[in-house]
Structure formats: structure tokens, C-alpha cells
Regions:
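Transmembrane helices with small-residue packing motifs
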Residues: 19-54, 64, 74, 395, ...
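Interfacial segments of transmembrane alpha-helices in multi-pass membrane proteins
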Residues: 271-328, 395-399, 694-740, 810-814
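Extracytoplasmic
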Residues: 55, 103-300, 311, 553-704, ...
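Interfacial helix-loop-helix hairpins and adjacent transmembrane helices
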Residues: 1-24, 369, 417-477, 773, ...
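Pore- and gate-forming transmembrane helices of large, multi-pass membrane proteins
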Residues: 278-280, 307, 346, 359-396, ...
Length: 862
């Protein structure tokens, strides 16, 4: 291995300009790839398509347009007035169906408001259109032209047979005969007709809109805009930004206040914050590491060279992201501080040893080669074990974690290769004309020299009092190990969004006005879903969900799923039955009438009758059957609007749905597949803890085996690995102590700490063996020499790495803050254990091996 390093570094130092030229060319290509990076912030991107909740979501998107909605909250003095209804009508027309709506057709699939049912009636739509024309006409002549056009329309002729419409139509004809002078009268008549239509509409279907899309007092209303599922998220967010500007300006100019929210706007806010945080965190990490490097080497050019290694490796990572189509996510925000912290350590170790060799009055080329050959094995082991740590992410089922591990793996590999090629080449170009006059700057640093001596004393103190140190360590291990039982999990991407953001506050306000706004659906698939048995089973499923014991409070109230927030075919047929009963009795069908229908008397007697009743429902309620039933009748949706709750609530909702679906599906009438945020989050939560165990265990095993093979000693391999084992347990203990959950970010800490933290243990073990077996020092002297020679480099690497992660604590995202703080503390503890605890293990191992050799037994050394 030393020969390989010698050849690579030797060639780099002999042809430094060629090496730098090749690296510059590769970097230019990487920049081209980096420009192709796209961003992705969505909950479903967390899981692979093979998961049931995601596979079902894709089917719902294909058949029904998906579950992604932008929401507009409107507030005003009276949103049920004709004037406010007109503004809402004009807005819906602007987005879908009217002049200028083509601008939004690639984004908007469907627009729903409290007016939607009314506007599906041709006569009502024609009346609203006439009202809009009269209010926006530029002259009396233009207004009367609109009136005359309406009077000869098919909709006006269909109103002729309605006695209550006769006075209205007669008044319009008189106004039309008066010409421009009749414009005012026409507008008055139309406004009165719209007011009457709204009143009758709310009386007939009030239970379907009041409290759901408009408050009973008319002070607030919500517009649900279904977003097309086939657009890339980057395009969705771009167009959503334009829609937000248009919406706010549209309503503000008409005297209404509008706020936008929904998942699309939360993800948009997440993207904006992530870009801002990436820049801020990267700059702060850069200045912090530059300061640490300056205190270590006290040379501006040294700072530039070590940072150049990291910057080039980062550019190569982003180039791979662009060419491989890997999207930038919230997890990507940790890439820059992470690589700054890890890759800089390799350069620090090489540069520190370079000055050590220069202090021996060697030339630049010889010093560069010697520095890599001597410290190269330790740096290689550090890089290889870190790579194994990130390689363990490949077994995760969660795509973002796999991709993050792949990128970090590449970054570590690039950082190592550049440290033994680019850095030596640059050092030779800088120093070869200086001969052998260079001195080792680290030795001249009094503070660092004091630190070296202090660390050596602390290590020797621990070595001389092994038993108390080991007992204390054992107590800590047991305490932290037991704490794993109390760790919670979190997988909701919406918790990434700071609660003071406008989109989050607006979403909360919408829920305060109208209840739950998250849509969770059951996709029912069967041969004949309109048959009476299927409809009864469908209703049985809805009842099983609504009346599930875990959906009920001790007082009998429903916690998550409510009948008034449930949309299904049985619900439509029940409402239609109530309407028919009310009409027969000569009364208005209030919302309570739906509940008064006898069980089962709402069920159509045949599929043919069901189809007829659905057509009638479309006329009576403005109900759009394709929103709940596919044209072939083989797939239907049951949609529940549920509140935004914590992960425990999401898990409970998922359990209720699965339990009810399991009971009904067992009959074989149809299959029930479930999706929506509770199901997606539940699937993700199930994987977080197993991901931690599987990836962490694999990383620890691979790293331990590699160190054992390279050291050719199980004892030394386990000793070097012990520091990360302790750091992982400390991580678990800290999570439990602080009360932080295991989430999409913190789940990666174990493997990361294993991969990056084992570097400290490797460098100490490698240098100890060098002092013990090559320099022939005794165990205590070897500990002293080891800590004094590598202590500064390890502390510098630990400060830069831990500091880079600690900088994440100022992020806007709480999961990223938790990730940064816990990782920083775990890595710092790994460094401390390597310098203080590991020497006690090393001297014990060395003493026992020496006794075996003296006794004539076979040692395990080289």
C-alpha cells in the first residue's frame, strides 16, 4: 500500500502542473453537471414507489389527479354576498375555463370553492357570467349587448318554464328595450337574481359547503386548487409562485384579503429557506474552518490549499448530482458543512506531516512523498472507514438516505485522492525553490505546544488509573444503551417548516376555520362498485372508520375522522335521498336530514338506478362524479379530510384506516388500498429505527473488519473501533436525554459518526504502533509520543469537523439543528475517547502481546 501511495504522490510531485491541469479540466466538467441540479422537497419523495402508500398515491394521481392542493384563504365582511361571490367566480374563471386561464392549465387541474356546486348548473353559471359582464363593462352599450346575448342563450330559454324566473326575464327584456338607459336596471335585476340563487343554493346544499369551504357567517372561505401531479416539482413551485402573486393581487384589488397555503407552498418555503441556509451555513463554516486552519498553520496559503481540496471535491459531488439526476433535498444542505469537516481533516494530517518532514531538512518533493507514505495509511484507513460508514446507507429503503450516502461516499473518496495528489503537487510548486530552509510552524506555536503537553498528561493520567476510567465508561455505556428504549421517531416533512412562516400560519388558520385539511383516501377497486352489495360494503367501511374505538374520545366525540369531512359515494346517495324526502314533504333539506334516513333505504336497487341517481346528483348538487368514481366504475375514492397532527396521531389514523380496511376487504367484495399523509408518514416511521440499526450495525462491522485486516490484529482493530462505539451510545443517550426524536436526519448520525469518528481511533492506534514497534518505545512512552505528535492534528480535525456540524445549529430547520448538534457532540466525544480512553486499551493490548511474545507464544504482530 505504501508503494501505491509513493507512486501516486511521486508522479504528482514530478508533474505538478499536469496534475493540476487534469484536476481543473475535471472540475470544469463537474461545474457543467452542477448547473443541471434540480430540487425536490416532498413527503412522498422520502419513500420508494414500491411502498403501498406511495404505489397507491401514484394510482390515485393517475385516476383522480392526486392529493396535492394549493389552498387560498379568503377573509372579508360577507363572502356570501353577490359581490363577493362574483369576485370568487371571476377568480375561478381566471384559473380554469375563462379567458386567460390557459396560463394556468399546466398547473391547475381543478378549482373548488363553495360556489363550485352552484356553478356546475348551466343556468347559474350563465347568470354569474352575465353579472360579471355587467360589472366589468366599459359602457352602457357593452352592458346591454351582454344582456341581449344572455336573453337569446340556451340557458335563458331553459329558464322560461320556471314561474319564479318569469319576472326576472321580463324585467331584463324591458331593460334591453331601453338601450343604454336600462343598464342600471339590468344590473340591479341580475344582482337580485344572483342573491336569490345563492340563498336557495345554500338552503338546499348548505350541509355540503357551510363549515367546509365557507363559514356560516360568511367571514371566511377557502378555495382548493388541485395541482397537476405530472409536473416536476421545480416547475410546480415556479408556477405556484406566480399563482401566489396573481391571487393576492387579484383579491386585494377587489377588497378581499387572500392568503395562500397548502403543501405546495410549504415546500416552496422549504426550498427558499434551504437555499438561504445553504449559503449562510456554508459561508459561516468556511470562515470558521479558515480560522482554525490559520491558528494551526498560521499561513494564508496553507488555508487556501487545504480549502481548495474541499472545494474541488464539493464541485465534483455536485457535478455527479447533476449528471446522475440526483435532486437536491433538505438533506443536501448538510453536504457542504459535512464535506468541509471531513475532507479538511485529510489535508490537515498530510500538511502536518509535511511540515514534520520539512523540519528534518528534506526538500519539498521528498517531504511531500514522505508525508503521504508515512501518514497515508492512517489517512487511507480513515477515508476507507468513512466510506464504509456512508456505504451502509445503501441498504436503506429510503431513497434520500441512499443518495445522500452515495454522494458523501464520493466526497470522501475525492477528498482523499485530492489530498494525496493535488495538495502535494501544489506544495511542491510553492516550496521547491525554497530548498530545505522551511521550518515546522506548528512547533513554534506555544498554545498548540501547551495543548500537546496537556493532552499527553491527561492520556497518561487515564492510563495510570485504568480501572476507575473503565468503570465510569461502563456505567455510561449501560445508561446510554438503556435509553434507546425511550427514543421517539419523526418523519413528517412539514415539521421541517418553521411555524412562523406565512404558509404555515395560513394553513393553521384554515384548519381553525374549517377543520382538517389533510386529505387521506381509500382507493376501492372492484368489478362493479355501483352494485348494491358494493355500496353497502363501502358504507360499512366508512362507518368502521368513523366509529372506530381509537377515533372516539371518552366523551364519544370523533378525534380524526368526521362524517362532515368525509366524501364518498354512499354519502352522495344519502344526501340525494334526504333531498328527495324533503321535496316530497314540501320542506327544505337541512343538513340533519341526511342523518335521518333509515339505514339502507338510500341504497339504489341496481347499478342502472345508481347511474341515474349519480346523474341526478350532478344536477342537484353540482356533484362531479369523476372526482369519486372512474368512468369504468372499477375504482372509487373515499376521501377523509383530517387534521394536521403529530406523528403519534398520524400513526393512530393509519392504524384506524388499516384496521377498518382489513375487516371489510376480508369479505372479497373489493380491494381497499390506502394513501395520504398518515399512511406515508407511518411507512416512513416504520423504517427510521430499522434504518438506524441496520446501517449503523453494518458500518460498525465493515469498519472494524477493515481496521483489523490492515493492522493484522483483532485486538488493535477493536481498540481503534471502540471510540465510535462509545460515541454512538452517547448519541443515543443525548437524543433521549434532550427528548429529540429519531428523524430523517438524525437517523444517519450513527453511520456518519462511525465513518468519520473512527478516524481519530485509527490515527492514535497507527501512531502508537509506529512508536512502539518501529521506534522501540515502551507503552507509556509510546502513548506520550503518540498524543504529542498527532494530538494537535486530531484536535484541529475534531474542532473543524465538529464545528462544521455545530454550525448547523443555527439552521432554520429543527431537524437539521438536531442533526448538527448531536453529530458535533458525538464526534467530539469520539476524539476525546481516542486521546484519553483509547490509550488505556492500547497499553493493555501491547503489554499482553509483549507477555505472549516473551513467553514464547505467537504474537499477532507483523
Amino acid at each position: 500500500m505504501k508503494r501505491v501511495f509513493s507512486l501516486m504522490t511521486g508522479w504528482s510531485t514530478r508533474k505538478p502542473w499536469l496534475v493540476l491541469g487534469i484536476i481543473a479540466l475535471l472540475t470544469a466538467v463537474a461545474v457543467a453537471g452542477a448547473l443541471r441540479i434540480q430540487m425536490e422537497f416532498s413527503q412522498e419523495a422520502l419513500l420508494p414507489d414500491k411502498y403501498p402508500s406511495i404505489a397507491t398515491l401514484r394510482k390515485v394521481e393517475e385516476d383522480f389527479g392526486g392529493l396535492n392542493y394549493a389552498k387560498v384563504l379568503l377573509t372579508g365582511s360577507d363572502l356570501l354576498s353577490p359581490e363577493a361571490a362574483l369576485v370568487l367566480f371571476q377568480y375561478q374563471e381566471a384559473l380554469q375555463g375563462g379567458a386567460g386561464s390557459a396560463e394556468w392549465e399546466d398547473l391547475v387541474l381543478r378549482v373548488e370553492s363553495y360556489l363550485s356546486f352552484l356553478l356546475r348548473n348551466p343556468q347559474a353559471r350563465a347568470l354569474m357570467s352575465l353579472y360579471s359582464s355587467l360589472r366589468t363593462s366599459g359602457s352602457g352599450e357593452e352592458a346591454m349587448a351582454a344582456v341581449r346575448e344572455f336573453l337569446v342563450s340556451e340557458e335563458a330559454r331553459s329558464m322560461e318554464g320556471e314561474p319564479e324566473a318569469a319576472p326576472f326575464l321580463q324585467g331584463l327584456r324591458i331593460a334591453a328595450e331601453q338601450g343604454e338607459a336600462g343598464a342600471g336596471k339590468a344590473e340591479y335585476l341580475v344582482e337580485a337574481a344572483v342573491s336569490e340563487a345563492l340563498h336557495r343554493y345554500l338552503e338546499s346544499v348548505g350541509a355540503m359547503v357551510l363549515g367546509r369551504t365557507v363559514t356560516a357567517d360568511g367571514k371566511a372561505a377557502v378555495v382548493n386548487i388541485q395541482v397537476r401531479p405530472d409536473l416536476p416539482q421545480a416547475e410546480v413551485l415556479r408556477r405556484a409562485g406566480k399563482l401566489e402573486d396573481f391571487t393576492v393581487d387579484f383579491f386585494a384589488s377587489r377588497g378581499l384579503a387572500a392568503e395562500v397555503s397548502g403543501e405546495v407552498y410549504m415546500m416552496k418555503a422549504l426550498q427558499h429557506l434551504s437555499l438561504r441556509d445553504s449559503a449562510v451555513l456554508g459561508i459561516i463554516a468556511l470562515f470558521f474552518i479558515a480560522l482554525v486552519l490559520f491558528l494551526t498553520f498560521r499561513k494564508v496559503l496553507d488555508i487556501f490549499l487545504t480549502l481548495a481540496v474541499v472545494f474541488v471535491s464539493l464541485l465534483w459531488i455536485f457535478g455527479i448530482m447533476g449528471f446522475a439526476g440526483i435532486r437536491y433535498t433538505v438533506m443536501g444542505m448538510a453536504l457542504i458543512p459535512l464535506m468541509l469537516g471531513i475532507d479538511i481533516a485529510y489535508s490537515i494530517h498530510v500538511l502536518t506531516r509535511y511540515y514534520e518532514e520539512r523540519d528534518k531538512r528534506k526538500g519539498a518533493e521528498d517531504s511531500a512523498v514522505s508525508s503521504v507514505v508515512t501518514v497515508g495509511i492512517a489517512v487511507f484507513l480513515a477515508a476507507a472507514t468513512t466510506i464504509f460508514g456512508f456505504l451502509s446507507f445503501s441498504i436503506s429503503d429510503l431513497p434520500p438516505i441512499r443518495q445522500f450516502g452515495f454522494l458523501c461516499l464520493g466526497g470522501v473518496l475525492f477528498g482523499f485522492l485530492l489530498s494525496i495528489t493535488m495538495l502535494p503537487a501544489a506544495l511542491v510548486i510553492r516550496d521547491r525553490r525554497r530548498g530545505v530552509r522551511e521550518t515546522r510552524r506548528v512547533e513554534e506555536h506555544l498554545l498548540l505546544d501547551w495543548l500537546d503537553r496537556g493532552l499527553a498528561r491527561l492520556s497518561l493520567l487515564a492510563e495510570r488509573h485504568r480501572l476507575p476510567v473503565w468503570i465510569g465508561c461502563l456505567v455510561l455505556v449501560v445508561a446510554c444503551g438503556l435509553s434507546v428504549l425511550g427514543i421517539s421517531t419523526s418523519a413528517d416533512f412539514r415539521t421541517f417548516v418553521p411555524q412562523d412562516l406565512p404558509s404555515y400560519r395560513s394553513f393553521t388558520r384554515i384548519e381553525e376555520y374549517f377543520g382538517g385539511q389533510d386529505t387521506t383516501v381509500a382507493l376501492l377497486e372492484g368489478e362493479d362498485l355501483l352494485s348494491p352489495p358494493s355500496l353497502r360494503k363501502m358504507d360499512e367501511f366508512v362507518s368502521a372508520v368513523l366509529d372506530h374505538p381509537r377515533n372516539l374520545t371518552p366523551e364519544g366525540e370523533r378525534k380524526y375522522f368526521r362524517p362532515e369531512k368525509t366524501n364518498s359515494l354512499p354519502g352522495i346517495f344519502r344526501a340525494l335521498k334526504a333531498l328527495s324526502s324533503a321535496e316530497a314533504a314540501g320542506a327544505n333539506p337541512a343538513g340533519e336530514a341526511v342523518q335521518e334516513a333509515e339505514p339502507g333505504d338510500w341504497v339504489p336497487v341496481s347499478r342502472e338506478e345508481a347511474e341515474v341517481l349519480l346523474s341526478r346528483a350532478e344536477e342537484a348538487f353540482g356533484f362531479e362524479s369523476t372526482s369519486l368514481l372512474t368512468p369504468d366504475g372499477k375504482s372509487s375514492l373515499v376521501a377523509f379530510e383530517v387534521p394536521f397532527v403529530n406523528e403519534e396521531g398520524e400513526k393512530e389514523m393509519a392504524f384506524i384506516l388499516r384496521d377498518a380496511a382489513s375487516a371489510v376487504s376480508a369479505t372479497g367484495t373489493f380491494d381497499i388500498r390506502l394513501t395520504g399523509m398518515p399512511l406515508i408518514i407511518s411507512d416512513a416511521l416504520d423504517k427510521l429505527f430499522t434504518t438506524q440499526l441496520e446501517s449503523g450495525g453494518l458500518a460498525l462491522l465493515l469498519c472494524a473488519l477493515l481496521v483489523m485486516v490492515v493492522f493484522r490484529s483483532m485486538a488493535y482493530g477493536l481498540t481503534a473501533t471502540s471510540v465510535v462505539f462509545l460515541a454512538i451510545l452517547l448519541e443515543v443517550g443525548l437524543l433521549r436525554l434532550i427528548g429529540w426524536p429519531l428523524d430523517i436526519m438524525t437517523v444517519m448520525i450513527a453511520s456518519l459518526v462511525i465513518g468519520a469518528g473512527i478516524d481519530f481511533g485509527i490515527h492514535v492506534a497507527h501512531r502508537f504502533r509506529e512508536e512502539l514497534y518501529e521506534n522501540r518505545l515502551g507503552p507509556e512512552e509510546a502513548v506520550n509520543a503518540t498524543v504529542r505528535n498527532v494530538g494537535t492534528a486530531l484536535i484541529s480535525a475534531a474542532v473543524t469537523t465538529s464545528g462544521a456540524f455545530l454550525i448547523l445549529a443555527i439552521s432554520s430547520f429543527s431537524p437539521l439543528r438536531r442533526f448538527g448538534v448531536i453529530t458535533a457532540l458525538a464526534l467530539a466525544s469520539a476524539c476525546f475517547a481516542a486521546l484519553v480512553l483509547e490509550p488505556t486499551f492500547l497499553t493493555t493490548v501491547a503489554t499482553r502481546l509483549d507477555r505472549r511474545v516473551r513467553a514464547g507464544g505467537k504474537g499477532s504482530e507483523d
